[in-house]
Amino acid sequence: MNRLPSSASALACSAHALNLIEKRTLDHEEMKALNREVIEYFKEHVNPGFLEYRKSVTAGGDYGAVEWQAGGLNTLVDTQGQEFIDCLGGFGIFNVGHRNPVVVSAVQNQLAKQPLHSQELLDPLRAMLAKTLAALTPGKLKYSFFCNSGTESVEAALKLAKAYQSPRGKFTFIATSGAFHGKSLGALSATAKSTFRKPFMPLLPGFRHVPFGNIEAMRTALNECKKTGDDVAAVILEPIQGEGGVILPPPGYLTAVRKLCDEFGALMILDEVQTGMGRTGKMFACEHENVQPDILCLAKALGGGVMPIGATIATEEVFSVLFDNPFLHTTTFGGNPLACAAALATINVLLEQNLPAQAEQKGDMLLDGFRQLAREYPDLVQEARGKGMLMAIEFVDNEIGYNFASEMFRQRVLVAGTLNNAKTIRIEPPLTLTIEQCELVIKAARKALAAMRVSVEEA
């Protein structure tokens, strides 16, 4: 039976939500009621699949905690008052921590002036952020297009590459196996997970995938495309594959790909949506090899965990195809004042506190601890790997990975799997994680593995 619209119901629901937003704390009955409401509304109005996923990785097989607020800079608090060390980082958005006061203050100050731009007059913060990114990014990257997410950033990069290379008769894109570049139609064509691709086939034509980290496979693909007249417009890569399971390529791989792109006249697009903004121990992961892309994609941590923002930064030569008609690719909310304020504050915090260097130091500490655990539990752990504060623990099978996430949840440490590699649990905490919290995370992982071994032996 069709349901009639109800203004009264919508008004009551929105008023109830606003009342909750105003409250700093909830009493016990309010917490219980909120839990019930959230689970019901996810089931009936968001997507029940999310509930089943949360049930599979949380303690006791329930639906898990209902997130209510940030705790400290590196923790989350649920409606029951339980505090979790955040080792997921919202899949890489909380590089400067939760509710970083510098970022929050910048957004609040801008909100008091002008939350959104007119679209017709020039907006100062977009100009200032573009100038800042031109100074911050490597090589000849100069012009920025702003959007709201990593997927949008990749879409813009693909369209920009097409606009630049189409007059040259180059239409093919090369991506890599295990890649994740987003789920909109263009970005999904570069993504390499059949689960996400098959329901939407056919995707955009002209995309090929080669094994990640295999430079000879890349050369062969470029050669074959040239021989068949399918000349390559661009190669798109993640410096480290995040959703693929935190897969690091062999040393020198990015440098070699850059040389191949130059040799074949292909653009190099680096997707640093997850690896950028200090995550791997450098401001951008490509800086570990001093590689300079033609187009760079950013998002996630660029907004400081406070505002959504993405950016596509390109050289003047490439970006100039948009000069004659800047409306060829635009978005209403891209580069809005609140998002730009958050991004400018985030960059300031990263540089002022030297967080990329901290990511390298604390990442080494955590990775050493995880590798020691891998040696102690070879029956459970296949490998620990990573760079900076982007790490992964790969288990011997999918079930053990899920059990580890559940046990860590019991230890009040939040972790999660990767979308393209179910055996792998990602460790991606804020770069602001303290040394003491790093030690607590390693202890929690040891307790989790010990409990899992007991369960296996008892079974």
Swiss-Prot record:
GO aspect biological process, one term: L-lysine catabolic process
InterPro entries found in the cross-reference section: Aminotrans_3 (IPR005814), Aminotrans_3_PPA_site (IPR049704), Class-III_PLP-dep_AT (IPR050103), Putrescine_aminotransferase (IPR017747), PyrdxlP-dep_Trfase (IPR015424), PyrdxlP-dep_Trfase_major (IPR015421), PyrdxlP-dep_Trfase_small (IPR015422)
Pfam annotation, one family: Aminotran_3
EC number: 2.6.1.82, 2.6.1.29
UniProt pathway: Amine and polyamine degradation; putrescine degradation; 4-aminobutanal from putrescine (transaminase route): step 1/1
Catalytic activity: an alkane-alpha,omega-diamine + 2-oxoglutarate = an omega-aminoaldehyde + L-glutamate; putrescine + 2-oxoglutarate = 1-pyrroline + L-glutamate + H2O; cadaverine + 2-oxoglutarate = 5-aminopentanal + L-glutamate
Cofactor: pyridoxal 5'-phosphate
Family annotation (CDD domains): OAT_like
Molecular functions (GO terms): diamine transaminase activity; identical protein binding; putrescine--2-oxoglutarate transaminase activity; pyridoxal phosphate binding
Cystines in this chain: none
Keywords: Aminotransferase, Pyridoxal phosphate, Transferase
Residues binding pyridoxal 5'-phosphate, per UniProt: 150-151, 274, 332
N6-(pyridoxal phosphate)lysine sites (modified residues): 300
Function: Catalyzes the aminotransferase reaction from putrescine to 2-oxoglutarate, leading to glutamate and 4-aminobutanal, which spontaneously cyclizes to form 1-pyrroline. This is the first step in one of two pathways for putrescine degradation, where putrescine is converted into 4-aminobutanoate (gamma-aminobutyrate or GABA) via 4-aminobutanal. Also functions as a cadaverine transaminase in a a L-lysine degradation pathway to succinate that proceeds via cadaverine, glutarate and L-2-hydroxyglutarate.
Similarity field: Belongs to the class-III pyridoxal-phosphate-dependent aminotransferase family. Putrescine aminotransferase subfamily.
PANTHER family per the UniProt record, alphabetical: AMINOTRANSFERASE CLASS III, PUTRESCINE AMINOTRANSFERASE
Official protein name in the record: Putrescine aminotransferase
Originating species: Escherichia coli O1:K1 / APEC
